[in-house]
Amino acid sequence: MAGLVAAWQLTQAGLKPVLVESRGYTGGLVAGSQLAGIAYDIGAEGWATRRPDTSQLATELGLVVEPPVRQPSWVWFDDGAFAMPSDAVLGIPSDVTSADVVTAIGGTAADLAAELDSRPVPDEVPESLGELVRTRLGEEVLTRLVGPIAGGIHAAVPDLLSADVVAPGLRAALVRTGSLQQAVAAQVRTRGDSPVVASVAGGMFRMPQTLHEQIEAAGGQILTRTGAKSISASPTGLEPGASPATAGVASDPVPDGHDAQGGRWLVTTAATSRNPNPSLPPIPDGDPVTYCTDRVIVACNAAPALDLLSDVIDVTGPALTAGAPIAHVNLALQAPELDGAPRGGGMLVAPGSTTVRAKALTHLSRKWPSLGASCPSHVHLSLIHI
């Protein structure tokens, strides 16, 4: 997506970029497919609305921004499923005495949370989300409310998450109000009825499709099954001491091992084929083609970006940490029992569950109105994260 957006922005400035993409489609983890004749998202299905950038981009592309159906989120524990409190930030409740919170954590834990949050705010407010919740509301609130939500969104335990990053302004509001519950309530009031996530009506996969179409309509080129192999400074085009350019992409190809007068960078590409393991990068198997250009944008995952840039800049730094593996299972169900959405738009599974192997379930056709409208009667699309 980053490469598509960059190329589209260049066309808005009157340039005609060349975008190379090693896979056979553009958009990366924003992609669509069909199941039972219904088009749906197989990757990312929406975005957080805390920042307006993605919603603004969708509008500029002529797409309709769609909020999800308002309904409670659910969490599964081995002792049962329960609805999460609606007036909350990352599962942190604005009122620990409310019925939904007491149902989730029990009366004793709710009383302890209220007592902890009544204590004076210390001079040193914990920086990690986990320690912040633990000290102000107790372990049960952290484990049963915050852990599943924060872990599901950020794929990390709360103790490893910076409160200022994942919940901006929350620590400052705690200092100002003297209560974590009141700090959450203030953020909930500010948020109002605005949804915390949104998508594109008809599927988020329409965003890369539209970007692709508009780039080509503006004169840009998109070369799929074409991977970048290397970037190097052009010996004739790059003046001593010149700084790397930060905008633009490749121009005309030149024979391998040659460069054109005036171009600062040589970008060598090659055709690719599908890897037998689709989760791994495609395999370069074509003859090299070198482009000479004044400006290059590198918009890809960290590991290949470091490889591409290693010949032109110092890329030494911390080792990259591999993400946790995850698989998606998509189901089209003929199930009248799901018409009432007994688990709303989906359910998270608490870490440590011994009865359910999945990490989460999303009832896609219930969550997104346009997708639900495209499903036949009693047919439901669900996504299981394993």
Question: Where are the model-predicted features located?
Answer:
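Glycine-rich FAD pyrophosphate-binding loop
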Residues: 11-34
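Hydrophobic/small residue at the entry helix of a nucleotide-binding pocket
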Residues: 1-2
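Dinucleotide-binding Rossmann-like beta1-alpha1 core, especially the glycine-rich loop
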Residues: 36-121
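Active-site/ligand-binding neighborhood in enzyme catalytic cores
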Residues: 113-227, 237, 253, 257, ...
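Conserved small/polar residues in nucleotide/adenosyl-binding loops
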Residues: 384-386
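Conserved dinucleotide-binding and phosphotransfer motif residues
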Residues: 13, 218, 289
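Mid-domain catalytic core of redox enzymes
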Residues: 226-379
